[in-house]
Amino acid sequence: MRKNTYAMRYVAGQPAERILPPGAFAGVSPVYPAGTPLSSDEKIRVLVWNIFKQQRAEWQSVLKNFGKDAHLVLLQEAQTTPELVRFATSNYLAADQVPALVLPQHPSGVMTLASAHPIYCCPLREREPILRLPKSALVTVYPLPDARLLMVVNIHAVNFSLGVDVYSKQLLPIGDQIAHHSGPVIMAGDFNAWSRPRMNALYRFAREMSLREVRFSDDQRRRAFGRPLDFVFYRGLSVHDASVLVTRASDHNPLLVEFSPGKPD
C-alpha cells in the first residue's frame, strides 16, 4: 500500500507537512542527519495507548496526567481532531500521524508524539483482507544523550484475517528496518494478538529481532479471548518501571514504561 502511504507532521506554528516514505530500503543502515536528543535526563518515559478515536471523555486528562513528562506518546486510533492536534503541538515538539482510515472529517491512525524532532520517519500501511480496512505503523528515529540512536516503532496490527499470513506480512517491513538498525529499539502498540497463532507469530518476530517484552506486575491490559492486545518490546535499554492505568477514557488501558539508556538486565 505504498502508493497511498504517508505521514502528516504537526508542529506548533507551522502548517501540517506530508512526509513520504524514504526510498527503497537498500539493505544497509541509512545515514541519519544530526538532531537534538529526545531526553536530557537519564530516563526515557513512553506512553502507549489505543485512544479509541477520542470517542470517550477524559482522554485528554489521561494524556496530561498519566502521561505527564513522557518523552514519547505512541497512540493508536488517533483521530486528528483540532483538540488532539492542539494538545500534541502544545506539549510536544513534533507529532507524526500515519492516516490509516480517512474519515469524513479527520483521518485516524497511529500517531507518535515526541519531545524531539525525529531524524528519520517511515510510514507503513497494511490492509485487512476481510474488511479491507487499513492499519498503520510508523518507524521514527531519535538521538539519545549518549549519542546512540533510538528507533521507535508505533504499530496498530491488522485485526480481522484468516490465518496469520497478513499479520506476519505487516511485520516484515518493520523487521527490515530493525534488522539494519544498530542502536536501541522500542516497538509498541496494539498488536491485536488475540489468538495463539498471532501470539506465536509476534513472539517469533520479537525473538528474531532480539527484542524483549516489557512485563507488568499489575497487568491490567485490555484482553480479548484472555490474551493481551497491547505490548511494549525493547532492545538495548533497561526497564526502570512499567505500569498500566485502568480508565474508561478508551476501550484500552494505557501503558507507561520508563526506560534507562543502559543495557538490559
From Swiss-Prot:
Cellular component, GO, one term: cytoplasm
Lineage top rank: taxon: Bacteria
InterPro entries reported for this sequence: Endo/exonu/phosph_ase_sf, Endo/exonuclease/phosphatase, UPF0294
Family under the similarity heading: Belongs to the UPF0294 family.
Keyword Cytoplasm found: yes
Transmembrane parts of this sequence: none
UniProt keywords, alphabetically: Cytoplasm
Subcellular location: Cytoplasm
Keyword Isomerase found: no
GO MF terms held by the record: catalytic activity
Pfam families: Exo_endo_phos (PF03372)
Gene3D superfamilies: Endonuclease/exonuclease/phosphatase (3.60.10.10)
Name recorded for this polypeptide: UPF0294 protein KPK_4510
Location, primary (coarse class): cytoplasm
